[in-house]
Amino acid sequence: MKIGKIDYETFSRFLLDRLGKKDKTVLVPPMTGVDAGVVDVGGGKVLVIAEDPIFTMPMLPLRTFGWFTVHIGASDVAVMGVKPRYMTYSLLLPPETSTKDLKTIVDSIHKTAVELGIAIVGGHTGYYPGLTAPMIGGITVFAFAKKGSYVTPAGARPGNGVILTKGPAIETSGLLSVLRERELAKKYPKSLIRKAKALCREITVVEDALVAMMAGGVTAMHDATEGGVIGGLFEIANASGVGMEVYENLMIYPDEVRMVCEAFAIDPVAAIAEGSLLITAGAAFVPKIIRRLERAGIPASVIGTVTKDPRKRTMRRRDGSVVPLAIPKQDPFWPAFFKGLSL
């Protein structure tokens, strides 16, 4: 069964050369590992724009689903170093959805957008057979910025430090602790499970990215979504044409993340990690970025360096083994997620 994002080979074969009319105003077109597009709109300004679908699961509160919708969409603009400003969304609902549930979702989306300073300027809402739960067919988030003021995952340079916020497998741990709570409760303390469930409200990198950008020296940012931290690191290195040496033992590892990954035999660095921000920055700026993040209540650590040789992109694992940075063939979150749905 094919689950999640298409792989690099499929993207290259079927999408990369099917991007509509060529337009010289497109400065950053669709490409693997790049979270948003950039268009020159004249007057020294650019439009930064991103698109995402959002799914939910039956036991996730609808308020949280609404919160996810805005934060996940906004994160893809924020990682370009630009504050999100506008959004549209398409809310698709099963026909049996109550007006109470509809109100809960749209109230949450509205409230979250207000908190982030985002105006909702369009969208679509409707009831459709075949759906078993509400979903966002697409959220589009965009903003204007000065030309040259944004970053992309292609900006990493040799000598840069590599920073990771929060640690690996944030989204994996949060969602699975909700979906498979009863299984965890048989083996682990309630206090740790509560911490894991609270990670659902950490599935965002909006503040992480904007704080880092304000500190200065950032050359690239990327949120570690499908394929996790190891996949996200590869995408930065590949887009930038550089090498990278990173160390798993330098990553922050919350106990609740260890618990979930241990319980379901998941490799933390390979699992979907929305909420974990990867940053490369000039070495002189790294301490300042870490301080600013920690001052904002966002844990972060330096996990390695960017190197010159693109043939050498490695991660030293906690057991001492050295593995190449690569996008996992299968994100380990999905089998654990669908097994949980079937229980």
Q: Model segments located where?
A:
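Helix-biased detector of long, well-ordered alpha-helical tracts
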Residues: 1-343
